[in-house]
Design a protein with these regions (language model features):
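Short amphipathic alpha-helical interaction patches enriched in hydrophobic/aromatic residues
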Residues: 89, 93, 149-153, 286-289
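Von Willebrand factor
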Residues: 141-176, 188-190, 205, 231-232
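Von Willebrand factor type A / integrin I
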Residues: 1-32, 38, 42, 170-174, ...
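Well-ordered alpha-helical segments embedded in enzymatic catalytic cores
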Residues: 105, 163-167, 274
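An amphipathic, basic-hydrophobic helix/alpha-beta surface used to engage anionic
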Residues: 1-136, 177-182, 187-188, 235, ...
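A conditional alpha-helix N-cap/helix-loop micro-motif detector
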Residues: 103, 157-161, 207-208, 271
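A generic local structural motif
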Residues: 66-68, 164-167, 211-213
Length: 314
């Protein structure tokens, strides 16, 4: 029996996101993500303007009238949604938690997919694979996916995207559309406000190289789109005096003086470098990405992504 609170929350997301799919994303998903080919539909009489290359000469000869072969897009796709459920995603300084944001984005993608008769699957991960839901169709299946993303309690705390991508390649037998939703925080690098940022950059370089290989392999097999979850407090420290910061994934804490202007400046520089390296990583392996922040409506970023992909395919 589903708890009343859970049912209401799933229902709210269903109403909100399905409305967005109808009003904002109608046609966008279909035009951007095409099927794997075409399949024969029917033979009909030739009409002015038809491509002469599609004429079926056997039927034309038999009937004495020109006929053409009509083909339709082989529409069915498999959409895999990979969601980072590590503890760093249970954070926000404004609006909603990154985990809540992930659930709503997953819902929009899932509803868009089933509206186009595509299959939807889910992989939730931390430093291990927490749950795998095989791809299926239908509203009931999508509601199950949303319910899991919203209320699943992970066993792991930290993040291992490489392991999630390797698991994806094991359980998928055909080319899929893959949405990888994560804050892309390498474990152990969340707390780095030190004035000397050299160790921080070295840690990022090491994590990037580990992830780069797995992401490149996955992107060759699938169409991978990274969706990054961000929060403004991860970029700027406020002047609040002596404060304690805790890394949600490792549990480590650090006591800092946030009134130190040099430290706040270094904190901002470190995180600016983190975002730049993340962008370089995606570009180096040809992975599209969408930056989502807790303080800005996510619909704008997703609409811009669809428009960019559509222009590129022309």
């Amino acid at each position: 029996m589903i708890p009343k609170e859970l049912f209401q929350k799933v229902r709210r997301i269903e109403i909100t996101t399905s409305r967005l799919v109808s009003d904002v994303f109608a046609g966008e998903y279909h035009s951007v993500f095409k099927g794997q080919g075409v399949e024969f539909d029917e033979v009909r009489e030739y009409q002015p303007g038809d491509d002469v290359r599609t004429i079926d000469w056997n039927v034309t000869a038999r009937t004495g009238k020109p006929h053409i072969k009509k083909f339709i897009e082989e529409r069915e796709l498999t959409v895999m949604i990979l969601v980072d459920v590590s503890l760093s995603c249970r954070f926000a300084s404004v609006n909603m938690l990154k985990s809540q944001l992930a659930a709503e984005i997953a819902a929009i993608l899932a509803f868009s997919a089933i509206r186009n008769n595509d299959k939807v699957g889910l992989i939730m991960f931390t430093d291990r694979i927490e749950k795998f839901i095989p791809p299926r169709k239908g509203l009931r299946h999508v509601l199950h996916v949303i319910r899991e993303v919203l209320y699943f309690e992970p066993e792991g705390h930290s993040t291992d995207i490489m392991n999630a991508l390797e698991y994806l390649n094991k359980v998928t037998t055909r080319k899929s559309i893959v949405f990888l939703i994560s804050d892309f925080f390498p474990s152990g690098t969340i707390l780095r406000p030190e004035k000397n940022g050299q160790n921080y950059r070295e840690g990022l370089n090491s994590s990037e190289e580990i992830l780069k290989k797995s992401l490149a392999i996955a992107n060759k097999r699938h169409d991978v789109i990274a969706i990054t979850l961000n929060d403004p407090r991860e970029m700027q420290l406020s002047d609040s005096g002596i404060i304690t910061l805790e890394d949600a994934e490792t549990g480590k804490t650090i006591l800092i003086d946030s009134s130190d202007a040099a430290l706040r400046r270094q904190y901002h520089q470190n995180n600016t470098e983190r975002l730049k390296q993340r962008e370089r990583l995606f570009r180096s392996v040809g992975t599209d990405y969408i930056d989502i922040s807790t303080d800005v409506p996510y619909t704008n970023a997703i609409v811009k992504f669809f428009a960019k992909r559509r222009r590129r395919k022309r």
